[in-house]
Amino acid sequence: MPSWREKHEKIVQSKILVIGAGGIGCELLKNLAVTGFRKVHVIDLDTIDISNLNRQFLFRKEHVSSSKAATATQVVKQFCPQIELTFDHDSIFEKKYNMEFFQAYDIVLNALDNRAARNYVNRMCHAANRPLIDSGSGGYFGQVSVIMRGKTECYECVDKPVQQTTYPGCTIRNTPSEHIHCTVWAKHVFNQLFGEVDIDDDVSPDMDAVDPDNTEAVTTEKEKEAMKEEPAPVGTRQWAESVDYDAAKVFDKLFLHDIEYLCKMEHLWKQRKRPSPLEFHTASSTGGEPQSLCDAQRDDTSIWTLSTCAKVFSTCIQELLEQIRAEPDVKLAFDKDHAIIMSFVAACANIRAKIFGIPMKSQFDIKAMAGNIIPAIASTNAIVAGIIVTEAVRVIEGSTVICNSSIATTQSNPRGRIFGGDATNPPNPRCFVCSEKREVFIYVNPDTMTVGGLCEKVLKQKLNMLAPDVMDSATSRIIVSSDGDTDDLLPKKLAEVSIEDGAILSCDDFQQEMEIKLFIKKGDRLAGDDFEVARSEKEPEPDDRKRKADGSEEPEAKRQKVEEKDDKNGNEAVAEITETMA
């Protein structure tokens, strides 16, 4: 059994690669330094935002807009000058971060906030045969997973379900049933009043929309005739300008007149509760004395009263109007970290929720939904980072006691603990990343799917390849080239390039050192670039693994998209737990 000196020497000599210098990354770098690790390299593409300062404790106000990796390196060296800490302000997807790069390190520690980057690091560590410790946190929950080639399941052995991020436009405008519907609508209201107007983000009632819960229900001719007697709803921006953005009148337009108009669509309310129109003066006197905007913003974890929501709505309109008039050529854009904008959206969402009988939420919760993120909690990040280092020490020492940890800091388990460990699972024999038999069966319609659709939708989006090269195994013909030599084939249907039922495609991604055999199975019921993925030849996976091409939606089912912040902001709102760095 090695002595503590021998163990310490292993820690000192080990070369550690840290990917991510955000919420978990800051805590992790500090922990590595004080534990005794001396050879550490950190990579992060992000820069410091003022909203990071409440939980990413290596950063200060003067660091805003600076590189996270560079600043974290500088600060850690100040309190631990003996550490050999280097950094790259770069994207992990750059070609220089190849298998040889990863092989230069003894262990890789993930503090990433998005699935694409985690997939890439997982594959590179597998190719380089380097241990990977993956981590994530979301609110009061967190997880740490140890991944070792041939011993444990990899990051992609289990499919990660994605939370819905699109909602039917008719649900948003006519029949919200969840607070997220009200939050999306409130963001649209902000854009209609102060931002870039998108005709797809109209907030007025949609008279011709079909009830999503009762597809047979339509607006009857009698209802249409009755509604014709009423003036049709006008555009939100047009209405606001006509009344000089009078807060009470804008309120009544959105929450009284539009709701009264909506109530005339009798077919919508046969199986659901009718909304209750709300007047500004009524709202202002409901729920006691309203809080001021400043007090309400400080109290962002409590649920505002209706009178406070009306007060915040009115105050924010005046504040935002002043900003617009000060810079008339500048259109405001939704920003979850802009205090006035976020308070306006929160007030709007809660007022609409009240009208439709939906429980109201705190601004903290609404911000999470509006930003399409899970808020980061500093204490959760600290616990996760501590567990990462504990597991890293075990791996370096060659310990056989390796486990995956889950954390819930809101309540303890029956043993009085806030986190627990689970035994690691063996590799999934059907995983196309870490199994010896890297095979994927897909169901497509060769008569409708294009070569470009196969490359973009299947290989890049579903299988997360970066620059695939595809060859027909039967004829050795290259149908997709990462160099662009076959771009003329991209518009062609698979059948036109002799890719039919039973075809086997050899797909190589040299950047990730990855090769997959893709078996083509014909699915006559599929259209366009639709496809289904199966892990085996016997049967396709469940329907929830189906991925449709973006343009294949029927017009009447057109969906209004929640703002999808890119991975830079840590906004992959998914059922798996991911860290929020931004």
UniProtKB/Swiss-Prot annotation:
Residues 204-214 have a biased composition (Acidic residues). GO terms for cellular component: cytoplasm; SUMO activating enzyme complex. GO terms for molecular function: ATP binding; metal ion binding; SUMO activating enzyme activity; transferase activity. Its EC number is 2.3.2.-. It is an enzyme of class 2 (transferase). Residues 219-231, 531-570 have a biased composition (Basic and acidic residues). Belongs to the ubiquitin-activating E1 family. This is SUMO-activating enzyme subunit uba-2. It comes from Caenorhabditis elegans. The gene is uba-2.
